[in-house]
Amino acid sequence: MKPTAFVVNTARGGIVDETALYHALKEGVIAGAGIDPFVLEPAPADTPLFELDNIIVSPHTAGVTEESIYRMGYWAAKNVVDCFDGKLNPDNVINKEVLS
């Protein structure tokens, strides 16, 4: 990676090697990082990444916004109604055998 690169992980803890990231940030191999999930959650207070000033961290709640909560509720309710009306999109169902 270029020294101007930023690593961002909003997916799952463990995707990014936290020890390697710490060293890359501390040694200036990359410019910065933004991390939402950690391998251990909640991340311990003594997590070495917390000592650095070129990283932004959040407690794995970056997706918890008013809009996301509204949309989760809306789509859950819509799928229930669609199911009862026989209009549920089968692509949204993991265990399709329950539809028959």
Where are these regions (language model features)?
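Rossmann-like dinucleotide-binding domain for NAD(H)/NADP(H)
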Residues: 3-100
